[in-house]
């Protein structure tokens, strides 16, 4: 998403655990992410540990979810 110039970061939505919100989750749009460094998603105003990521969607479809096995794996 960040390194492929043909990929549009705004198509991605990343859901992270957020202890400060009433729902316990925070939604981050891909174009908010400036970089990924040392296990953190770097936003313009925050750094979020990657271990808090629970789901990634692209174009409204789930492409990764914590605890979900990748397709084709047994």
From Swiss-Prot:
InterPro entries (alphabetical): MJ1316, UPF0248
- Membrane-crossing ranges are none
Per the record, a Pfam family? MJ1316
The source's superkingdom equals Archaea
Q: Which HAMAP family does the UniProt entry name for this protein?
A: UPF0248 (MF_01245)
Q: Which family does it belong to?
A: Belongs to the UPF0248 family.
The protein's name in its UniProt record = UPF0248 protein MK0350
Q: Which organism is it from?
A: Methanopyrus kandleri (strain AV19 / DSM 6324 / JCM 9639 / NBRC 100938)
